């Protein structure tokens, strides 16, 4: 299903909520209401405008595991538990997205103490960027009270491709000192109610959805479970919140001020009675004084709580100015944007929908002929002197673009190959905006997506190259030249040298029987080989990149009919050769390309004053004739 690019669209995360037998034993008859209360708080976090997307977390199924059922294996290892749960939930999920029982993601709540590699401080685990992958869109959460809502939101944030706020990619986006107060903090204590999601989290989920990875979230569920709308503190007082966090013998420590900011609970630790905290605030709605209740970690008068009950939908602000062009020549991209700030949505109100980031082409003129490298080559070459990338590589590398074997969905990643070693790596998750998607394509990369553009480098243009590689031409400026070759001898033989400027090259080997014995080869003007030289053959299909960023598609030596094809135009002469390694029978090589027609010389136009000059000459001739008659 095609969706609008760079648009804010309502997403519905249909969620399967599962609780294991330890949850059932701890919570008893109140388990279902507790789980829905936790999910309501998690859904509220996803409705906050700081995430900058309309994300609706809905519960479509709730399963409580019991004895006698085939259940996932839940144990101390968080990684093993996650793997087991992901496998189990996939078998429970109907594959058809329109099925009412289908879900987009699954989350397991357990009272099992989960452990990571070195410590048992883990509160959950999930894969990153897996939301529409039925086998991996899953998460596990260790229940430790109502604050588990933020653990659930945190793990689902990973499912939406969010990283921890202290990660390197988030450093520039978040700024200094802001990595500990958001949902995606590596260790959560108090989440800022005014901005639960960091700028990095908002950027990552936006890019993730803009790149089409949330396609399964566009359908609205028919009959989701109703989540509680009352503040959780009304159903679970401070004592009960302590019991949910520290165990049934715990109670609230009322003597520790200030109220609401952090929940302190009485209990026993290592045999000593003491007050302890996990630094989470009291749940919203918890009574904190006469006619007072907590909200966002503050103790407010109950009349003020009404302001938090009324949803306010957001509205788009004005369009901003067009930004800088991503390129100075050769076809760049520039953006404008608008924000959902007129007004900002509040209290779970609807986030703005519609296009938020339009873009257009800019600086489409050709780059100077002195530019030795293509735009993608420049981006790869920027890593040539980086010695910190791979410890096993001795010194600087000569990085060049890699096209062969790169899937179409990965065309806009900066995949580069170390020329000397042949290894290739994704050096950047996306190329610069305006980079051609491939050597023979007019389409360009925009924010990591391949966007259609015409041969005039205008995004959305329908102009195409003709056979002569004239943009918008009618094919009249060139003519087809064809030939064949069948005088084969052992070793390499020249077939034809194709001059520079030729377009739409096609070479095809035809006929033959028995074992394959001849192969195509390409030799450059400097004598080096671009394909199948030095008796080394390319077995599979590949893009042969020639000087000037011209690409020819080679079928591979194992193809039944060996072919070479490409649009051109060639920047340098190219010699087509055949390598004969056996006794070819009934084999013929055919080739064709298009040659520019000679431009007819334009007759010299008469001078602008030719009528006056003609009159003057006629007058001179008339006078001479008259004088001759005298």
Curated annotation (Swiss-Prot):
Propeptide section residues: 1-5
TSP type-1 domain span: 313-368
Ranges of residues in domain Disintegrin: 233-303
Keyword tags: Cleavage on pair of basic residues, Disulfide bond, Extracellular matrix, Glycoprotein, Hydrolase, Metal-binding, Metalloprotease, Protease, Secreted, Zinc, Zymogen
Comment on bound cofactor: Binds 1 zinc ion per subunit.
Subunit relationships: Interacts with SRPX2.
Active site: 155
Lineage, broadest ranks: Eukaryota, Metazoa, Chordata, Craniata, Vertebrata
SMART domains in the record: ACR (SM00608), TSP1 (SM00209)
A Gene Ontology BP annotation from the UniProt entry: extracellular matrix organization
GO MF annotations in UniProt: metalloendopeptidase activity; metallopeptidase activity; peptidase activity; protease binding; zinc ion binding
Coiled-coil residue windows: none
Broadest EC class assigned to this enzyme: hydrolase
Cofactor list: Zn(2+)
UniProt cross-references to InterPro entries, sorted A to Z: ADAM_Cys-rich, ADAMTS/ADAMTS-like, ADAMTS_ADAMTS-like, ADAMTS_CR_2, ADAMTS_CR_3, ADAMTS_spacer1, MetalloPept_cat_dom_sf, Peptidase_M12B
Function: Cleaves aggrecan, a cartilage proteoglycan, at the '392-Glu-|-Ala-393' site and may be involved in its turnover. Also cleaves COMP. May play an important role in the destruction of aggrecan in arthritic diseases.
Annotated glycan sites: 96, 474
Span of domain Peptidase M12B: 11-221
EC numbers: 3.4.24.82
Protein's recorded name: A disintegrin and metalloproteinase with thrombospondin motifs 4
SUPFAM superfamilies: Metalloproteases ('zincins'), catalytic domain, TSP-1 type 1 repeat
Catalytically driven reaction(s): Glutamyl endopeptidase. Bonds cleaved include 370-Thr-Glu-Gly-Glu-|-Ala-Arg-Gly-Ser-377 in the interglobular domain of mammalian aggrecan
Domain comment, as recorded: The spacer domain and the TSP type-1 domains are important for a tight interaction with the extracellular matrix. The spacer domain is also required for cleavage of COMP.
Changes after translation: The precursor is cleaved by a furin endopeptidase.
Summary of the tissues where the protein is detected: Brain specific.
Region (Spacer): 479-630
